[in-house]
Curated annotation (Swiss-Prot):
GO molecular function: mRNA 5'-UTR binding
HAMAP family referenced in this protein's UniProt entry, alphabetically: CsrA (MF_00167)
Record text on subunit structure and interactions: Homodimer; the beta-strands of each monomer intercalate to form a hydrophobic core, while the alpha-helices form wings that extend away from the core.
A Pfam short name: CsrA
Gene that this sequence comes from: csrA
Name the record gives this protein: Translational regulator CsrA
Family: Belongs to the CsrA/RsmA family.
UniProt subcellular location: Cytoplasm
GO (cellular component) term, any one: cytosol
Entry keyword Repressor: yes
NCBIfam families: csrA, PRK01712.1
Organism the protein comes from: Buchnera aphidicola subsp. Acyrthosiphon pisum (strain APS)
Main location: cytoplasm
Length: 57
């Protein structure tokens, strides 16, 4: 796992088309913004797990 440190307003780039920006930090919560092409699914982990569980039914 790659571990990075970013400050509010800083961005990291994944591949050529995906950016992840730190929008804010409040207590133990971090707000991030993700820009990705429409064909790339972006989900919170708990939502992704629910989707995968539904596919198995």
């Amino acid at each position: 796992m790659l571990i990075l440190t970013r400050r509010v307003g800083e961005t990291l780039i994944i591949g050529d088309e995906i950016t992840v920006t730190v929008l804010g930090v409040k207590g133990n919560q971090v707000r991030i913004g993700v820009n990705a092409p429409k064909e790339v699914s972006v989900h919170r982990e708990e939502i992704y797990q629910r989707i995968q569980a539904e596919k198995k039914k």
